[in-house]
């Protein structure tokens, strides 16, 4: 079974909680052991990225990506893929395509 650890950075870690639950529901259906949690973007500097495979950016904080990426690089976490969550999937709480995007980024090791 494929394993993945995801953190979703969002504005206040409230709406992304719905996404987290959707991802947790979908993961076993596609054979993925998934640990996923959300964190408020204001705390991105305090988060422990040591056990994260993919960082996902919620649509409402996309503008902070230009601050988050340099921070990750200076802390040595620039090899962790950072993925923008599709706005439509986020708004409709479609966990499966969000999870698939995270898996693809982890496998390819890319930052979009």
In which residue ranges do the predicted regions lie?
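Mid-chain, well-packed structural core segment of small domains
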Residues: 48-88
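Non-catalytic signal-transmission and effector/linker regions of two-component phosphorelay proteins
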Residues: 1-2, 110
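Conserved active-site segments centered on acidic
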Residues: 3-43
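Gly/Ser/Thr-rich loops at beta-strand to alpha-helix junctions
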Residues: 11-17, 61-63, 90-91
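Short, well-ordered alpha-helices that flank and scaffold nucleotide-derived cofactor binding pockets
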Residues: 21, 25, 29, 70, ...
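Structural motif
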Residues: 43-49, 92-95
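Ser/Thr/Gly-rich flexible loops in soluble cytosolic domains mediating phosphotransfer, phosphorylation
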Residues: 77-112
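Residues at alpha-helix caps and immediate loop-helix transition turns in enzyme cores, especially N-
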Residues: 19, 67-68, 94-95
């Amino acid at each position: 079974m494929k394993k993945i650890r995801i953190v979703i950075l969002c504005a206040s870690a409230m709406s992304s909680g719905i996404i987290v639950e959707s991802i947790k529901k979908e993961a076993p259906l596609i054979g993925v052991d998934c640990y996923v949690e959300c964190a408020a973007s204001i705390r991105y500097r305090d988060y422990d990225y040591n056990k994260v495979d993919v960082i996902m950016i919620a649509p409402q904080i996309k503008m902070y990506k230009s601050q988050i990426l340099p921070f990750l690089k200076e802390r040595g976490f620039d090899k962790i893929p950072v993925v923008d969550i599709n706005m439509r999937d986020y708004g409709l709480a479609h966990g499966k395509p969000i999870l698939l995007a995270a898996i693809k980024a982890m496998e390819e090791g890319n930052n979009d």
